[in-house]
Amino acid sequence: MDRRIAKLALEYAQKNIGVVEEGENAGEAVEAYLASCVPSLPAGNPWCVAHVRYRLKQAATALGLTYDKSMPRTGYTPDYVSWAVKNGHWVSSKKVAADKDLVRPGDLCCFYFSVMGRHAHMGIFEKWIDETHFYTIEGNTSPPQDIVGVERDGDGLYRKKRTLANLGENGGFIKLDF
């Protein structure tokens, strides 16, 4: 994927921070995100990945570039992680702990939930704040002041302050510069 797509997708996400649901996993913006998936997902479905997919597709179109045809188009985080591992685009949080330069603005962050036994939430990496904290833009999450932890079924699109530990034991990043 052309790096410009990842960077513009991040810019679009930043401009839409604060978009909230109208109902549960519904509303005009949320339904547009869900419709961007293949197959299209109806209102009521989790939309964190759908938001990422929507922004990448939107950015590719705006730049007149092709969205990588091998990349998943679903709304399911494990599909993206499997694809990234298979194609050499996966970077574990353990590797990133040793080298912060492995992840760049616009890359995708994938959260692993041990209680579910899978990756179950995705956002867009924004930037490092310091040695241990970074910002993400995440859909279908709780507001930043909610410090309960990682919320994968919240009400909006927010900037979140995270640590690598927040990604879970098998969490990591999908590099989008290929």
Q: Where does each model-flagged region fall?
A:
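N-terminal capping segments
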Residues: 1-69
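...with weaker cross-activation on analogous glycine-rich loops/strands in unrelated enzymes
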Residues: 10, 62-144
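Active-site signature of cysteine proteases
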Residues: 128-178
